[in-house]
C-alpha cells in the first residue's frame, strides 16, 4: 500500500512542505507546522489503513526526503525506516531527536553527484549524521542532478525488498 501526502504550501504551480531561508535552513514556523502536518497525516493513514509500524517506510524526494528524516528523527518507533532521495538531515531545525530510538533504524539515502539544488555534501553530511546517531545507513551517489533515475530507483527497490523480507 502506498500513500502519498501532498505538501501543503503552493510554490509556482507545485507544492512545498515549508519555506526556505537558505539552502539547508528551513524557515522555523512553516517547518514546525509541516512536521506536525506529517505527523497528523501518518496518524490518520495508520488509523484508516491499519499498518504494522514495522512495515511502514517513509519515502521522500527533496523536501519530502527532509520531512521523512525529520519525522523519523523525532518518532523513530512509528516507522520501520526511511528512503531519502536528494535531501539533507535537518539537525539544526530545533527538532527534539530520539537518539535511543534511532539505534539500528534503517535508512537508505540516494543523492545526485551533480545536484545543484541540494549539494552532494548535504547528502554526505546526512549519511554521516545518521551514522553518528546509530542508524543503519546505506548511502548511494549517482551521476545525476536533483532528480530520480531508473538506476537509483532500482537500488531503492532492492533495499526495500531486503527490509521487508522478515
Positions of predicted regions on the chain:
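C-terminal catalytic histidine-bearing segment of alpha/beta-hydrolase fold enzymes
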Residues: 108, 121-166
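Short beta-strand/loop motif that positions the catalytic acidic residue
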Residues: 108-111, 115
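Short aromatic-enriched loop/helix-cap "lid" or pocket-rim segments at secondary-structure transitions
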Residues: 13-17, 95-97, 151-154
Amino acid at each position: 500500500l502506498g500513500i502519498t501526502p501532498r505538501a501543503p504550501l503552493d510554490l509556482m504551480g507545485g507544492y512545498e512542505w515549508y519555506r526556505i531561508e537558505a539552502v539547508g535552513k528551513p524557515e522555523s514556523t512553516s517547518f514546525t507546522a509541516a512536521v506536525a502536518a506529517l505527523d497528523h497525516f501518518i496518524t490518520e493513514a495508520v488509523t484508516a489503513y491499519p499498518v504494522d509500524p514495522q512495515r511502514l517506510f517513509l519515502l521522500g524526494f527533496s523536501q519530502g526526503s527532509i520531512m521523512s528524516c525529520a519525522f523519523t528523527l523525532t518518532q523513530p518507533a512509528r516507522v520501520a525506516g526511511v528512503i531519502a532521495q536528494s535531501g539533507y538531515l535537518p539537525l539544526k531545525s530545533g527538532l527534539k531527536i530520539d537518539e535511543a530510538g534511532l539505534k539500528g533504524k534503517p535508512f537508505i539515502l540516494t543523492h545526485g553527484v551533480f545536484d545543484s539544488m541540494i549539494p552532494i555534501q548535504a547528502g554526505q553530511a546526512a549519511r554521516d549524521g545518521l551514522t553518528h546517531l546509530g542508524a543503519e545507513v546505506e548511502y548511494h551517489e549517482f551521476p545525476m542532478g536533483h532528480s530520480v533515475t531508473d538506476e537509483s530507483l532500482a537500488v531503492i527497490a532492492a533495499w526495500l525488498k531486503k527490509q521487508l523480507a522478515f
